[in-house]
């Protein structure tokens, strides 16, 4: 180099060789105020902050090595004589101009950047500018302790092309990498005025540092970037996230002449000073940019860079795009990067430049961020919206290019198409292992092999698929531990082929129209796979290795035209495949009867196999929650049983008062863990059908075609407290019980003699004429009403056929609106009027008059008298049936008719 004279001040060797760790802070009047922060270049602005002292590196960032001698040696500056250089004060770099002097009064510029050593500089003069000399130390008096991390992109080739070298992090490095430049930001005005190679390289290096600097803010404040506070760009985040478009804050404003760059190992592109030499906006594309140069829109105003609080990595800054030195796979993908713009707005090439269509979105980052607000790092795709057919119904129509998977539920019948298993397989089959020979094809229960037939289609041959499915209570799917095995030989009549569909072996056969689209499945066996292989390969733990029951599943795709098919599927009965079960487990193939009264006692015959002399038959009932509610063992008749037949007596059901059929199950057990599959059975409620007494001439209930009793019958009650019936010639009929214990409408007949004397709560309707019909009133014919008790000699008692519950609603219509006749009962009249209001129905204590409630009026005497005499809790249906049979036992036949047999 040239002369080593310095006219500013003498050289301090302690600072040059790094012997002094920290310099005392400068006072207000120190030399740190010589450089105005407003007029200083961006690199000088960086030096005015408060750097982190050595030894106080944040967690997660490698501590830089200690300073070495020569690390802080001052860079040279141009001397007055051409071609010579002289030393600068520490931490200041002067780029000489045409009128530069040793005293710094010329037109040179002073640049002060941390960890930068200028080994050589281009002699091209700078534009004439004026700037004061830089201070000796940084604004806070701290030494320059910010070398870049090791290996930070330092793979640029050494040596200079065109006579220029560049900055290096240490004196021993001669790399030309602009990655090692450790500045913070670039000033737009300074970069616009600078036209030499050094300024262009400085612009590139400054933007590179601003995008990937690992240093946090020593002031821990996420304040916006200002020239007075350059390190606040990298303050820790307080929870908010800065816009990702802040990577453009270091871009240059206008075209600057580019300089040739040396070739790089990885085909790294050459950047110009006309724009930000970085990848495309992270809000638009995840990809890096290694293309050619192109025009770029002006950058937006500077936006803050905030450190990502959720990451501990040294390069995780929100708003900083990944650089090419960081592999693509290791970059943190934010929500803005994950959600790309429409395809038409994406960059057309990987050149790092934004397309013209996205300039507005980049210029207005707030709008783009507002659209993406509330998202996390990765954009979760919207859930797959199933069609209506998937949600319910499972439409079996598919495209030929997208057939349904094997676990897709399919019906066995669709419109006129039906896939039917004509002959079911046997309930057990000995599956063979991979290490042993074949056990043969699956047999059918009556003999032979299963038969499958397709109904509703007979146009051309179709392919029938068969696989082994599950037989548990869950949806049908391929079994993990069993698969179909192809049987071959000269005794096999059906040709088959093996195929693998989604990891499941499928046997394919042909349905021919000449065979009526039927196939005899004599070519299919069952192979047991090794448990360890399946559990390790598929992770099948929900099915379990003890699940040894399977089904034969058949599937066919019927073409429909237009590139679509209809898929139908049929599954066989469960097949037990375990070795022990084939020998010891009982199997029930048929039983009769399938229903019985709750009283039990009937004989049940089971047909099957593997029945033993000590086999047991157990009836069980489970509740809706699956818990056992009832269990009873049936008595087996050993004398009438064999290995294939069991005869037993059906036990009595636990609840005999049920009003509807009850579904229960039974199974055959040969001992512990040797049970047959459960079979369904029904218990029916008891039908009350009492036989009449021996002295009774009435074998059933009277009909409604005529009067049921003679004129001289006495129905006085022989045994209180049961009600009495009328004697003499009644013009009414006794109501009788129908199914559901309802009441039929009583028929009325005209009076032919004096009115009878009776004590009863019976109700009757008048007849409108004739002796054969029972015409009813137009609107109230279904409402029974009693005659006044005082006119017929006595007070009414309780209705003999009353029940603890009220009769059905159709038998209680509203009361008639017409007033009653003055003569309530006239022998010469053919019409019997309705009783008067306020009639004492069941006694003097009950008068449903004007003040009575509607419930009492509509209920009449059905429930009130019954509740007065017989307690509700103390009567059963059997007692009601007994009362009915006893009181109706003396009813004779109609006059002129034979008594019923």
UniProtKB/Swiss-Prot annotation:
Tissue: Expressed in heart (at protein level).
Residue segments, region Calcineurin-binding: 114-119
Comp. bias regions, Pro residues: 61-81, 215-227, 254-263, 805-822
Any one Gene Ontology BP term: long-term synaptic potentiation
Source organism, top-level taxon: Eukaryota
DNA-binding region: 430-437
Region (Disordered) location: 1-180, 203-361, 697-721, 791-868
Feature: compositional bias, Low complexity: 114-123, 166-180, 272-288
Ranges of Gly residues composition bias in the record: 96-109, 151-165
Motif, Nuclear localization signal: chain positions: 268-270, 672-674
Residues of the IPT/TIG domain: 586-683
Residue stretches of each SP repeat: 213-229, 277-293
Protein name: Nuclear factor of activated T-cells, cytoplasmic 4
Species the sequence originates in: Rattus norvegicus (Rat)
Gene that this sequence comes from: Nfatc4
């Amino acid at each position: 180099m040239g002369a080593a004279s310095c006219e500013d001040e003498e050289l301090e060797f302690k600072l040059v060789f790094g012997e002094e760790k920290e310099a005392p802070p400068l006072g207000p009047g120190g030399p740190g105020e010589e450089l105005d922060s407003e007029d200083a270049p961006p690199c000088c602005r960086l030096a005015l902050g408060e750097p982190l002292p050595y030894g106080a590196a944040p967690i997660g960032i490698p501590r830089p090595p200690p300073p070495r001698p020569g690390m802080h040696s001052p860079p040279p500056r141009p001397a007055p004589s051409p071609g010579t250089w002289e030393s600068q004060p520490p931490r200041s770099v002067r780029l000489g101009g045409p009128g530069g002097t040793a005293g710094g009064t010329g037109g040179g510029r002073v640049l002060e950047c941390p960890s930068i050593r200028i080994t050589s500089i281009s002699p091209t003069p700078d534009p004439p500018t004026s700037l004061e000399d830089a201070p000796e130390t940084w604004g806070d008096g701290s030494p320059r302790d910010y070398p870049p991390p090791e290996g930070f992109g330092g793979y640029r080739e050494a040596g200079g092309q065109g006579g220029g070298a560049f900055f290096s992090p240490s004196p021993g490095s001669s790399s030309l990498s602009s990655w090692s430049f450790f500045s913070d930001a670039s000033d737009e005005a300074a970069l616009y005025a600078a036209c030499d190679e050094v300024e262009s390289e400085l612009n590139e290096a400054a933007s590179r540092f601003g995008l990937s600097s690992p240093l946090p803010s020593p002031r821990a404040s996420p304040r916006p970037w200002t020239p007075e506070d350059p390190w606040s760009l990298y303050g820790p985040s307080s929870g908010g996230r800065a816009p990702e478009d802040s990577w453009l804050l270091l871009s240059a404003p206008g075209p600057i002449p580019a300089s040739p760059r040396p070739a790089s190992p990885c085909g790294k592109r050459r950047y110009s000073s006309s724009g930000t030499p970085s990848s495309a906006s992270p809000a638009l594309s995840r990809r890096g940019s290694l293309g050619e140069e192109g025009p770029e829109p002006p950058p937006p105003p500077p936006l803050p860079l905030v450190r990502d609080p959720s990451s501990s990595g040294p390069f995780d800054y929100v708003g900083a795009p990944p650089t090419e030195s960081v592999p693509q796979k290791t970059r943190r993908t934010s929500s803005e990067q994950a959600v790309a713009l429409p395809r038409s707005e994406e960059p057309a090439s990987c050149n790092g430049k934004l397309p013209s269509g996205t300039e507005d979105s980049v210029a207005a980052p707030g709008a783009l961020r507002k659209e993406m607000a509330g998202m996390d790092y990765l954009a979760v795709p919207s859930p797959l919206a199933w069609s209506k057919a998937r949600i319910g119904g499972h439409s079996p129509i598919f495209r030929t290019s997208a057939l349904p998977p094997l676990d897709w539920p399919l019906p066995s019948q669709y419109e006129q198409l039906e896939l039917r298993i004509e002959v079911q397989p046997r309930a057990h089959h000995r599956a063979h292992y991979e290490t042993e020979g074949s056990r043969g094809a699956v047999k059918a229960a009556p003999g032979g092999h299963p038969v499958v037939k397709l109904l509703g289609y007979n146009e051309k041959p179709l392919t029938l698929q068969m696989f082994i499915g599950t037989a548990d209570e869950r949806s049908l799917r391929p079994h993990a531990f069993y698969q179909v095995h192809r049987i071959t030989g000269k005794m096999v009549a059906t040709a088959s082929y093996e195929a693998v569909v989604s990891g499941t072996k499928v046997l394919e056969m042909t349905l021919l129209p000449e065979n009526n689209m039927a196939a005899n499945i004599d070519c299919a066996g069952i192979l047991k796979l090794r448990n360890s292989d399946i559990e390790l390969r598929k992770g099948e733990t929900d099915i379990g290795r003890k699940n040894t029951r399977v089904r034969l599943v058949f599937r066919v795709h019927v073409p429909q035209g237009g590139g679509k098919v209809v898929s139908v599927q049929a599954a066989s009965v469960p097949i037990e495949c375990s070795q022990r079960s084939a020998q010891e487990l009982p199997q029930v193939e048929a039983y009769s009867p399938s229903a019985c009264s709750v009283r039990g006692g009937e004989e049940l015959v089971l047909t099957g196999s593997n029945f033993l002399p000590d086999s047991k038959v157990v009836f069980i009932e489970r509740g809706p929650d699956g818990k056992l509610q009832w269990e009873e063992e049936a008595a087996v008749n050993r004398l009438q049983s064999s290995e294939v037949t069991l005869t037993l007596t059906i036990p009595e059901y636990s609840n005999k008062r049920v009003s509807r059929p009850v579904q229960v199950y039974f199974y055959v057990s040969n001992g512990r863990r040797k049970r047959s599959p459960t079979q369904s059975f029904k218990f029916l409620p008891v039908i009350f059908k009492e036989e009449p007494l021996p002295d009774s001439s009435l074998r059933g209930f009277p009909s409604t075609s005529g009067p049921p009793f003679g004129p001289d019958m006495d129905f006085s009650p022989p045994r209180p407290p049961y009600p009495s019936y009328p004697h003499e010639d009644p013009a009414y009929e006794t109501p009788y019980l129908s199914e559901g214990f309802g009441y039929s409408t009583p028929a009325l007949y005209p009076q032919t003699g004096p009115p009878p004397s009776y004590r009863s709560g019976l109700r009757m309707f008048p007849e409108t004429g004739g002796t054969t019909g029972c015409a009813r009133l137009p609107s109230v014919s279904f409402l029974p009403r009693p005659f006044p008790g005082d006119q017929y000699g006595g007070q009414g008692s309780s209705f003999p056929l009353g029940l603890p519950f009220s009769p059905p609603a159709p038998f209680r219509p509203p009361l008639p609106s017409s007033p009653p006749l003055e003569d309530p009962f006239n022998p010469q009249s053919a019409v019997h009027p309705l009783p008067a209001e306020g009639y004492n129905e069941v006694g003097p204590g009950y008068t449903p008059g004007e003040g009575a409630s509607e419930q009492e009026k509509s209920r009449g005497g059905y429930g009130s008298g019954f509740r007065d005499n017989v307690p509700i809790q103390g009567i059963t249906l059997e007692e009601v049936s007994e009362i009915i049979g006893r009181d109706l036992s003396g009813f004779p036949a109609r006059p002129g008719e034979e008594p019923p047999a």
